[in-house]
Structures are given as structure tokens and as C-alpha cells.
Design a protein with these regions (language model features):
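Hydrophobic alpha-helical membrane-insertion signals
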Residues: 33-54
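N-terminal small/glycine-rich loop or linker at the start of catalytic domains
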Residues: 22-38, 155-170
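Conserved strand-to-helix beginnings and helix N-cap segments that scaffold or border functional pockets
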Residues: 44, 209-210
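Aromatic-lined carbohydrate-binding/catalytic grooves of carbohydrate-active enzymes
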Residues: 50, 54-118, 122-209
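Conserved small/polar residues in nucleotide/adenosyl-binding loops
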Residues: 216
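Active-site core of glycosidic bond-cleaving carbohydrate-active enzymes
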Residues: 213
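Mature N-terminal, pre-catalytic/accessory segment of carbohydrate-active enzymes
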Residues: 1-35, 41
Length: 216
């Protein structure tokens, strides 16, 4: 992965002319994540309220990104817990879609598109949280993997799960079908105009193949 850099040259620099120029690292994203304040329960109106505050008070200082954390597809979301076993909001391919009770502008298949548009009009960016892997619900229903002849049970690794969030199974590392699943998921998120993804549960023990398959 290549990370772009910017180069700044100081005209008063007394170093030799052939010395490497100093390189400034890009700053990390600056913004706000909904988890600490809302857990899994944030609503569309609360996102917009925080976006307006950021636009009015923080944007000029470089704060420009809002991230909707875990549970945006959970119709039974509560505080900072997870609703193990509850039916989640997913599409025909098992990809998570927003809970329309909390995000009413997502109705009629619009997803986060209208909300992203509203945030963009404030000069800000919108992101969401996703877990590695594939929803267990998609696997139990053996839903198709979009763009392939495969189904969820063909690509899932049911032995490789998260210890603290039971929404997903892992995906078969290094498998073309797993890549197709991630591609389809990211295609949907990108179609909504999202700017940022927080990909969670990428922790020890690390599996380089699974990290690599997340790059789409």
C-alpha cells in the first residue's frame, strides 16, 4: 500500500543541496465517532445534530469526519450492548443496511445515501463502522454472494469469530469468494457516498490474508 506524502522545502535550510527534503506525514482523519456517546443506538437526527455542531464549531480547525459506529443495522439496538441472535437489517445478498426506524431517510433502498448527502452539504464527511467477516444471518440463510455463483456458506469460516461481537462469522482467508463478498459490501457502501470505513476486529492474532482481502 502506498501512502502519499507531501514535501516541504524551507528556503532558509542550510543543509547540502543534495540532502533529502523533509517529508511531512499526512494527518490522521479528524472527527467524531458515535460509540462513546450513543453505543449502538444512534439515530439519524442525532447524527445530523452532531454534524451541525461540528460544521459550526470545529470544521475550521480541521475536524471534518463523522463515523456512525456499530449497530446501525440492528433494529433492537440498546446502549453499548449487542443484540445477539436478533434479526438484522440485511439485503438479498446479506449485506447490512440501515435500520429504517432510526434512519428513516434510508427507506426505499436509499441506504445512507440521503444522510451522506446532508452531511456533505455541511462540508463534512460521513463514515460507518463494519466488522470483518460476513453476517451470521447471511450464512444461516445461505444468501448468494453478489456477482458470483457462490453462497454465503461457501465463503464463511464459522470457526473464526469475534470474541465480543457475535454478528459475523469470519471469511475464508485468501479465498476468491471472500474477496467477492468484501467487494460487494464495499460497492454498496460506496454507492451511498460514504467517505470512511472503520473496520473492526482486526486484532491479534493477525491474519495477513484477511487484512489483505479487506483492501478493495
Amino acid at each position: 500500500m502506498t501512502i502519499p506524502t507531501t514535501v516541504s522545502v524551507d528556503p532558509t535550510d542550510s543543509r547540502p543541496a543534495d540532502a533529502p527534503a523533509p517529508v511531512k506525514a499526512w494527518r490522521p482523519p479528524m472527527g467524531w465517532n458515535s460509540w462513546d456517546s450513543y453505543g449502538t443506538t444512534i439515530t439519524e437526527q442525532e447524527v445530523l445534530d452532531n454534524a451541525r455542531f461540528m460544521a459550526d464549531h470545529l470544521k475550521d480547525a480541521g475536524w471534518d469526519t463523522l463515523v456512525i459506529d456499530a449497530g446501525w443495522f440492528d433494529p433492537n439496538a440498546h446502549a453499548h450492548g449487542y443484540s445477539d441472535g436478533t434479526p438484522l437489517c440485511i439485503d438479498a445478498y446479506g449485506r447490512q443496511i440501515p435500520d429504517e426506524q432510526r434512519f428513516p431517510s434510508a427507506a426505499d433502498g436509499k441506504g445512507f445515501g440521503p444522510l451522506a448527502d446532508a452531511v456533505h452539504r455541511l462540508g463534512l464527511k460521513l463514515g460507518v463502522h463494519v466488522m470483518r467477516g460476513i453476517p451470521r444471518q447471511a450464512v444461516h440463510e445461505n444468501l448468494p454472494v453478489k456477482g458470483t455463483a457462490l453462497h454465503a456458506q461457501d465463503v464463511a469460516d464459522t470457526e473464526h469469530t469475534c470474541a465480543w461481537n457475535h454478528d459475523n462469522y469470519g471469511l475464508k482467508r485468501g479465498d476468491a469468494g471472500a474477496q467477492a463478498w468484501y467487494d460487494a459490501q464495499v460497492d454498496l457502501l460506496a454507492s451511498w457516498g460514504l467517505d470512511f470505513l472503520k473496520v473492526d476486529d482486526m486484532q491479534t492474532p493477525f491474519f495477513p490474508e484477511e487484512i489483505a482481502v479487506s483492501y478493495t
